[in-house]
Amino acid sequence: MQSQYPSAHAPTADEAMLWNREALPPGPGQEAVLRGITGEMADKGFVVANLDKLVNWARTGSLWPMTFGLACCAVEMIHAYMPRYDLDRFGVIPRASPRQSDVMIVAGTLTNKMAPALRRVYDQMPEPRWVISMGSCANGGGYYHYSYSVVRGCDRIVPVDVYVPGCPPTAEALVYGIMQLQKKIRRTGTILRG
């Protein structure tokens, strides 16, 4: 069986990091890239990297949500923060102030009276900011869709990045939604250019 590493010895931690899924396949092309990086390190003492990817990677590990619990979905959101699911392991730490958060989780039925408050809190969040709509009521009105006092989806008030379906969605569904948001952040550039 042929080794996936170019040398016969067991890889060091640094070598193993180079051979992840996004790396070049082993071969002359990869060796040329590695020689170029090694030469640049020897000449300058540093490597020029893509700042946008680095910042997006850092943001995915430190999402600070502003929890906007409006109804029964908020109970499932609380479950996601408890020891069984422990969102802290993903770097997701809830904040009480919108000025310190970059993600808003809208969980539950949004009424017409609450909609201006939701928009005000969203506007107070610093850029870049993301919104997760959690539950059928936040996604499209849910069970109360035809009520005169219910907004038929929070995406009519704020732009939504991830929709978590369910009535109420499970804590696992919220964790999956947060992981999908992390993927979205990694894929898109978020550094504002003037």
From Swiss-Prot:
Pfam families referenced in this protein's UniProt entry, alphabetically: Oxidored_q6
Protein name per its UniProtKB record: NADH-quinone oxidoreductase subunit B
Origin organism lineage: Bacteria, Pseudomonadati, Pseudomonadota, Alphaproteobacteria, Acetobacterales
Superkingdom in the source lineage: Bacteria
Cofactor or coenzyme needed: [4Fe-4S] cluster
Cited function: NDH-1 shuttles electrons from NADH, via FMN and iron-sulfur (Fe-S) centers, to quinones in the respiratory chain. Couples the redox reaction to proton translocation (for every two electrons transferred, four hydrogen ions are translocated across the cytoplasmic membrane), and thus conserves the redox energy in a proton gradient.
Gene Ontology terms for molecular function: 4 iron, 4 sulfur cluster binding; iron ion binding; NADH dehydrogenase (ubiquinone) activity; NADH:ubiquinone reductase (non-electrogenic) activity; quinone binding
Catalytic activity: a quinone + NADH + 5 H(+)(in) = a quinol + NAD(+) + 4 H(+)(out)
Membrane topology: Peripheral membrane protein
